[in-house]
Amino acid sequence: MSPLDTAPPVLKGEDGEGSVQVHQDDSMKIEGAKVFSVYGKGGIGKSTTSSNLSAAFSKLGKRVLQIGCDPKHDSTFTLTGSLVPTVIDILKEVDFHAEELRPEDFVFEGFNGVKCVEAGGPPAGTGCGGYVVGQTVKLLKQHHLLEDTDVVIFDVLGDVVCGGFAAPLQHADRALIVTANDFDSIYAMNRIIAAVQAKSKNYSVRLAGCVANRSRETDEVDRYCKTVGFNRIAHMPDLDAIRRSRLKKKTLFEMEDAEDVVQVRKEYIRLAETLWNGTEPLAPAPLPDREIFELLGFD
């Protein structure tokens, strides 16, 4: 029987009225590595941020695993230089007999030794993406691929905050939110904060802070953070070099040493050091929708 044929067990109401979540088997807990889950509005640059952060951790000498949790499976392509097959694709090829898989079938080495996995997802409108993430972690555990890893980064689909795509929060120590200095991005961040706060009642995950990405200024992000008790822990400016790195299928650490590129690399290294050394667990108070409109100057 396919591991995806069985409906995932769910718990209702444990972290908010009407909440439905995928239950984590304690044996699937990731131990020994620091685990980060990256969220943000769709199209905000989570994959770019995750990949460059993975590269930065590797530059610090850490053994890194990045897990893409989006059916688009493009999370790791700047690390590997290609769109690698997903765990779900590989399982389909062996009729979901996971015991037939070898690590090299679904784990691919990227820039500076970063290990890359794309979980993939079920067809649109079917299945549970969170369950797919669980099966991916299960495979990694079965093949002992997490034992020699210092850092695990989950790059999570868009700003979806359902129980299924909150599944990486079950494994994460800290959640990081990628945002920009505009209303839509901050609005999405506010919703993600509410979701993480709800899940943290049952899981050990806590918020680490936010990254202002593709933003010349950070005034709106900083104003929001000050209001709710959150922290901006990095600022990645809106550089054409970042866009070009995506087109070249490379991380920023492989681009030419232009002054602006060097500065952004330093910011990623600083972010990696901050996360590795540990951040204070944050408990911001998300705002009602109307208050966000008022805060950011909308009538």
Curated annotation (Swiss-Prot):
InterPro entries: NifH/chlL_CS (IPR030655), NifH/frxC (IPR000392), P-loop_NTPase (IPR027417), Protochlorophyllide_ATP-bd (IPR005971). It comes from Dinoroseobacter shibae (strain DSM 16493 / NCIMB 14021 / DFL 12). It holds the Pfam family Fer4_NifH. Residues 1-24 are annotated as: Disordered. It is an enzyme of class 1 (oxidoreductase). NCBIfam families: DPOR_bchL. Its EC number is 1.3.7.7. Homodimer. Protochlorophyllide reductase is composed of three subunits; BchL, BchN and BchB. Binds 1 [4Fe-4S] cluster per dimer. Component of the dark-operative protochlorophyllide reductase (DPOR) that uses Mg-ATP and reduced ferredoxin to reduce ring D of protochlorophyllide (Pchlide) to form chlorophyllide a (Chlide). This reaction is light-independent. The L component serves as a unique electron donor to the NB-component of the complex, and binds Mg-ATP. Mg(2+) binds at residue 47. Pathway: Porphyrin-containing compound metabolism; bacteriochlorophyll biosynthesis (light-independent). This is Light-independent protochlorophyllide reductase iron-sulfur ATP-binding protein. Belongs to the NifH/BchL/ChlL family.
